Amino acid sequence: MSLESYMNQIGQQARAASRLLAKASTKQKNMALFAMAEALENARPRLVEENAKDMENGRAKGLDSALLDRLLLDDKRIDGMIEGLKQVASLPDPIGEISDMVYLPSGIQRGQMRVPLGVIGIIYESRPNVTIDAASLCLKSGNATILRGGSEAFYSNQAIAEAVTAGVVAAGLPEHAVQVLNTTDREAVGKLISMPEFVDVIVPRGGKGLIERISKDARVPVIKHLDGNCHVYIDDEADLDKAFAIAMNAKTRRYGVCNAMESLLVHASVAGDILPKLVFALQEKGVSLVGCDQVRSVSGEIGAATEEDWYTEYLAPKLSIKIVANMDEAIAHINKYGSHHTDAIVSQNYTKARAFMTEVDSSSVMVNASTSFADGFEYGFGAEIGISTDKIHARGPVGLLGLTSQKYVVLGDGHTRDN
């Protein structure tokens, strides 16, 4: 079978499955999730065995230690996948909820019903556990899924797919509710993002290059998660003890995550009080620092920040620092250089905090809290499929609700409209 025929078949199967999933009961979907968890447990030896092939191939190709770590499937990570399925099963099912039902002057009632998007294509790299994250969220939200994992995780993903299908079928749901492409041909990605007749939305998870390419070439709407160039602004009316704790947590909790602080902005009037202490603590943690001329004059031996630094998501123990004259300058800097992901203000002034929340154009805006809280679990959504930096359709952490839409429903009793 040609690649085009294969992809068309996958698309047709997904579309047919989506019609059945849209009317599946919450009980049936939860049964499938628990059955998937049981199938993963039973397949544990096979998962480890197939992952070993991917790890061996990865080492042969010279993948670095960070990529190999993402690729690894050990007992702890398999336990995490199983627990993740059970957590998604415990989440409220949004499908079928009717809200904003009102009587109108004509006598009809109008409301909105929560419905699935339909068929979701998910393209991702390296981490095989994403296969379970994506499959579980899409299934619970009533969507059929076509998954295209990275070629480096091919054997792991195929083994996971077998367990997923076994669980879905055991619960009486359509066999093709979740499909993992069984080809490493890169042309499959191009086809997947060009099938609007079968696919309703694409969710890419991976590096900036992958996401930009898909966004540019797709003929299907894309929910994208681009850079996490996150800022913390320390205001002149900040509690400096809180500011110190927030800045340290936002930067050093984890370096390689999208909600880590990459740039620190400090009001000029408090820079001399907090920067020397912060710089020392960050350098003690091994963080490489670059800053503007004012920062360097206050804080001693740190590198000079370039224009490129202000735009950069380091995903590493590195931080850029800038002193600003006021909050307006901080907001202008964030809106120019930031990635619209997550930005924070530390201030005891309510009016300033409100203005910052209103004017900063990001998917999450924090007041007196670390950027590290930008996360589906921390927001009470349960699992997430990513953090969208778009404004349409979903924005911020994308959980079950972000994988749904709404349609209007109208109730009448023989009502007709006058001419």
UniProtKB/Swiss-Prot annotation:
GO cellular component terms, A-Z: cytoplasm
The enzyme's E.C. designation: 1.2.1.41
GO molecular function list: glutamate-5-semialdehyde dehydrogenase activity; NADP binding
Family: Belongs to the gamma-glutamyl phosphate reductase family.
Role according to the record: Catalyzes the NADPH-dependent reduction of L-glutamate 5-phosphate into L-glutamate 5-semialdehyde and phosphate. The product spontaneously undergoes cyclization to form 1-pyrroline-5-carboxylate.
Subcellular localization, as worded in the UniProt entry: Cytoplasm
GO biological process: L-proline biosynthetic process
Keywords associated with the record: Amino-acid biosynthesis, Cytoplasm, NADP, Oxidoreductase, Proline biosynthesis
Protein name: Gamma-glutamyl phosphate reductase
Catalytic activity: L-glutamate 5-semialdehyde + phosphate + NADP(+) = L-glutamyl 5-phosphate + NADPH + H(+)
One Pfam family from the record: Aldedh
Gene (name only): proA
Pathway: Amino-acid biosynthesis; L-proline biosynthesis; L-glutamate 5-semialdehyde from L-glutamate: step 2/2
Organism classification: Bacteria, Pseudomonadati, Pseudomonadota, Gammaproteobacteria, Oceanospirillales
